[in-house]
């Protein structure tokens, strides 16, 4: 299966960092393995016309996402981060009862 097949008609495209904290030894290998899977404007153009882009943050611009993708009108990354904050506050409130 190809990236294009996986993205076609998708309503949501999401990604995460290629190298997590603590996995630095795998950095070169992972960058090489994932280099063809960067989410960028061209990739989003292959998806549904109303696609949204999400990322759980933090992100490495130029690796898993292109430099300007956060500024793309299809990006909802900052909304996602804000909503996560409110969800976490609600969980804390519930846990502290």
Question: How would you label these PLM feature ranges?
Answer:
Residues 71-97:
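C-terminal helix-to-coil terminal segments
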Residues 1-68:
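Rossmann-like adenosine-cofactor binding region
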């Amino acid at each position: 299966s190809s990236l294009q097949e996986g993205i076609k008609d998708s309503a949501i495209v999401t990604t995460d960092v290629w190298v997590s904290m603590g996995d630095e030894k795998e950095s070169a290998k992972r960058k090489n393995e994932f280099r063809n899977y960067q989410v960028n404007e061209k990739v989003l153009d292959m998806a549904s016309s109303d696609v949204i882009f999400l990322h759980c943050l933090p992100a490495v611009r130029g690796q898993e996402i292109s430099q300007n993708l956060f500024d793309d009108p299809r990006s909802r990354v900052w909304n996602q981060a804000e909503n996560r904050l409110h969800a976490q506050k609600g969980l804390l409130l519930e846990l502290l009862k």
